[in-house]
Amino acid sequence: MVDIATNLQRVRERIAAAAERVGRDPAEVTLVAVTKTHPPEVIRAAYELGLRHFGENRVEEAAGKVGELPEDITWHMVGHLQSRKAARAVDLFDIVHSVDRVKLARRLDRFCAARGRTMPVLLEVNVSGEASKYGFPIADRDTLEAAIAEILTLPHVRIEGLMTMAPIVADPEDARPVFRGLRELRDALATRFPQVEWRHLSMGMTDDFEVAIEEGATIVRIGRAIFGPRGTR
């Protein structure tokens, strides 16, 4: 039996220690508990321990959970989002971390307009250069800046920052250049697009979140360290 309470306490302590090592306030870091494959009762147990931010990777799976759980949960879409599922995502999620193309932003904007809401989004950036990763390539700054300029014309989508996925590495230190690269990109974009409040850097998961926090993460996406290995559907 996984002891979620003990695991969560350890994660919170590690978040605080990582922030304090670099002179940051731990309160600047939002813990998003990633609940892919975990059932509503597990999420409810975490909710009762004080968690309010939960992340899902798939629209279909989230659809079976969101309505079963308290309304004051903030739901984060942290997985790749297909454009054809944008309407459902607008109904389920409070923020999308994985906007990696203008077409998706346009569809989110359209469905948000129909529902009278504005969706906070993060732009996913492929910092590592791995072909298996989604995201705007960090090396193609012109394409990224053109995309940002276009997304900024959409009234029902609000850019709030950047997200990246680090490569799977044996030593978390090997992920540091990826996290640093995203932070440096954010700083450059803040100069280029001062009208955007670049509030968030969503980066860092179970194996590397402490390094991500040291490099400026404001959102960490953690599943296994809290809930243990993923269950089977």
Residue ranges of predicted features:
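Conserved alpha/beta-domain cores
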Residues: M1-F209, I213-E215, F227-P229
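Gly/Pro- and small hydrophobic-enriched strand-loop and loop-to-helix capping segments
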Residues: A217-R233
